[in-house]
Amino acid sequence: MLLFLLCLPFLSKAQGIDIPVTSKTKLNFSGMLQSQFNYSLDHDIDIKGLHHSGDEQVSHNSFSVKRARLQLNATISDRINAVILVNFGDFTGNPQNKVLENAFIKYSINDYVNFQFGQFRPQFGQEDNYPVDFVQSIDYSNQYYLFGGNSWQSFQIGASFSGKIKDIAIPIEYSIGVFNGNNRNTVDNDDGKIFPARLVFGLSKETHLGLSGGAGKNMGQKIWAYGMDLDYKKQLNEKWGIKFTSEYKQGINSQEFFNQTTPVIPVSRYAMRGIYVLPNVSYSFKNTRLKDLEFAFRYEYLDADFKQSGNARQTYIPMLSASFAEAYAIRVQLGLMMDRYQRNIPNTTEYNTNRVICQVQARF
């Protein structure tokens, strides 16, 4: 952390600062800032999506710093690099077990053999392939956060083996790992581990099919999850481009099981599943400050406990995005988030909501 603070004065000068350490070692600093304005359109819903049945004063609009990330990437040799990623935006809330996101060492022998150790995101879905600043919606899916809370996605501590085979009719990317299974910045509390695996098939230059699956143990309970995703991207001409992403997942919701004081129902009865589709249309400009305009619409269905008293959540997010630099380095997004639950539960976040979100992003 001290290293980051000492280097902060230099971070505003360039996009990724290269600092030679030795003839073989090079440090690269980069950062990302996301700031939001949230406005609740419902008089009884606050900006966090919590329903209020009484007459208490609540906040219906607020500015916030969603993420303030700083990353150090150290290229130690032609085969070894180390990455540290912190999010200072976590200090706006409870920072316990947060702030530090990536902290790993990667050893790459060739395209076929790569090892990774430390804290990083397991490969278990399409959304694990890119940072949040490249998501073509306001944020990752609700599915991503639910499966992340159950240790299959988001930042976990462990090790993985990955690679890709390119020179065949259908190129294949593969990954398998072993992780503690109790989320980031936390010492393991049992001997159980989870084993996620993933295959991605390049069906064509534009189309990729991903298959994910995993099993393991958490506090002596057997858990599992699996998923499938499809990604299609095509540049129609110099100006127009389209992209379509869809993902389905299902698994054991061990988080819900362990939240109970005295669980009497077997963990296999706590099951979660979800699907989302995200079409995106982009229009590019040349020789102007405005580089791209995009329209995306995410539809998502998620049920965190579908075998018992589940309360299915459907989310609709139309979004307009304007990029003023290449690769979303400067981006302004305006979206409407509409949540619809199978049944409304008063004084909880499981209640129909409508929120306008404006997000401004800068990468450097």
Where do the model's predicted regions map?
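Bacterial Sec-dependent N-terminal signal peptides
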Residues: 1-17
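Short, well-ordered amphipathic alpha-helices
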Residues: 14-15, 159-163, 199, 228-233, ...
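Sequence/structural signature of outer-membrane beta-barrel proteins
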Residues: 36-42, 87-93, 124, 179-185, ...
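Detector for outer-membrane/organellar transmembrane beta-barrel domains
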Residues: 48-49, 202-305, 314
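C-terminal closing repeat unit and adjoining cap/tail of repeat-based domains
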Residues: 319-335
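Outer-membrane beta-barrel "beta-signal"
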Residues: 351-364
